[in-house]
């Protein structure tokens, strides 16, 4: 099967029963906890690479997005903007976490494509490698 579901997890109480259920449904599981018993994203990428998987779609909330960016496993970002404003002091952001104090510490992106899909706008960006400054110079 070209498309298969894989679930990564860190050890948790009562996980064995859930894992059994997933296996009976044909879902593959990968256990790769870090020292805080959270999923070690770098270890997960190595594991998936060893299985011949060279790209993934990471869909999640701001905390997962922050963890993935900090782990250095993100090469491309796709953001969708809908013609709606929500606002609010406690509003969720695409990247949660502790943030950065200075603009120079921010993750830099380079636009690779912008298009309209229905009423939404999709923005694709390459994540810049700060070690290779020229990889993300914006063309004028």
Identify the residue ranges that each predicted region occupies.
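Enzymes that bind and transform nitrogen-containing heteroaromatic metabolites
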Residues: 1-140
